[in-house]
Curated annotation (Swiss-Prot):
Gene behind the chain: REM2
Chain positions recorded as GTP binding sites: G121, E122, S123, G124, V125, G126, K127, S128, N229, K230, S231, D232, A260, A261
Modified residues (Phosphoserine): S27, S295
Family from the record: Belongs to the small GTPase superfamily. RGK family.
Chain ranges passing through the membrane: none
Coiled coil: none
Single GO molecular function: calcium channel regulator activity
Official protein name in the record: GTP-binding protein REM 2
PROSITE patterns: RAS
Organism: Homo sapiens
InterPro entries: P-loop_NTPase (IPR027417), RGK_GTP-binding_reg (IPR051641), Sigma_54_int_dom_ATP-bd_1 (IPR025662), Small_GTPase (IPR001806)
Length: 340
């Protein structure tokens, strides 16, 4: 009798020694123990480490996810649903277009259908009014918009082909150190140098602006159009139509007069810019691109630096008198934006 009691007491003592003091009460069946939780955690960490070492190619631009960030929704799906790791993050829609200067390169097919036009020139000549007219804004005809936008994008039909035309009006906005202007030079497909026919000073700045454009992109055959704006102000005119065309012929540019206030020739201007871009691209693809400076067929690089103002004055003073007949003939076609 005493032997059975002693045996039961010995078994209880051994059970108490094996179990911790705080876990004497039996847990319900199916409840995970701390040891099981630790095992599952180690397995998860091991699986993540194996995925990191597997060398799976990640999608370009995929952000690194911290442990505190939520798991993407697609990874919360049931295990029965197949999920491709390369599907995240989602790719950008091809129907969108680039609206900023610092965007990345587009696909070739998309890039061919997007034309970026830069409005450049002195302040007060009507660049913002031209941009607003292109964007379809209805503003005061006597003043420029008080709060103009920076960029306008529209899809237009030119010669039975639909294109996306983006017009930038950022030449003077917060240009500390000229960084923004230099960025414009590297981004635009065509440049519209706007001057006011009522302000001769803005007209005299055109050669300097053009030289800056060509100095920033010396290896590119960029279309440039001289735009004489405010042609409706006949009594205040200081620059004649003949002077504008003559300067355009001298500088190998196109010329057009517009009135942004009356929407005169504004449609012809932007459609002509698209045609000029197409013509230049077609000529470059056909092998008719200008030779690079320094090559046997191109001009020699300048030996020393010279200010843009001096270059403009020397350029006009040397070329116009000797080749006046040539420039007169060239100026006759400078207003036709459908030909080179």
């Amino acid at each position: 009798m005493h032997t059975d009691l002693d045996t039961d007491m010995d078994m209880d003592t051994e059970t108490t020694a094996l179990c911790p003091s705080g876990s004497r009460r039996a847990s319900p069946p199916g409840t995970p123990t701390p040891e099981a939780d630790a095992t599952l955690l180690k397995k998860s960490e091991k699986l993540l480490a194996e995925l990191d070492r597997s060398g799976l190619p990640s999608a370009p631009g995929a952000p690194r996810r911290r442990g505190s960030m939520p798991v993407p929704y697609k990874h919360q799906l049931r295990r029965a649903q197949a999920v491709d790791e390369l599907d995240w993050p989602p790719q950008a829609s091809s129907s969108g277009s680039s609206d900023s200067l610092g965007s990345g390169e587009a696909a070739p097919a998309q890039k061919d259908g997007i034309f970026k036009v830069m409005l450049v020139g002195e302040s007060g000549v009507g660049k913002s009014t031209l941009a607003g007219t292109f964007g379809g804004l209805q503003g005061d005809s006597a003043h420029e918009p008080e709060n103009p936008e920076d960029t306008y994008e529209r899809r237009i039909m030119v010669d039975k082909e639909e294109v996306t035309l983006v017009v930038y009006d950022i030449w003077e906005q917060g240009d500390a150190g000229g960084w923004l202007r230099d960025h414009c030079l590297q981004t635009g497909d065509a440049f519209l140098i706007v001057f006011s026919v009522t302000d001769r000073r803005s007209f005299s700045k055109v050669p300097e602006t053009l030289l800056r454009l060509r100095a920033g992109r010396p290896h590119h055959d960029l279309p440039v159009i001289l735009v004489g704006n405010k042609s409706d102000l006949a009594r205040s005119r200081e620059v004649s139509l003949e002077e504008g065309r003559h300067l355009a012929g001298t500088l190998s540019c196109k010329h057009i007069e517009t009135s942004a206030a009356l929407h005169h020739n504004t449609r012809e201007l932007f459609e002509g810019a698209v045609r000029q871009i197409r013509l230049r691209r077609g000529r470059n693809h056909a092998g008719g691109q200008r030779p690079d400076p320094g090559s046997p067929e191109g001009p020699a690089p300048p030996a020393r630096r010279e200010s843009l103002t001096k270059k403009a004055k020397r350029f006009l003073a040397n070329l116009v008198p000797r080749n006046a007949k040539f420039f007169k003939q060239r100026s006759r076609s400078c207003h036709d934006l459908s030909v080179l």
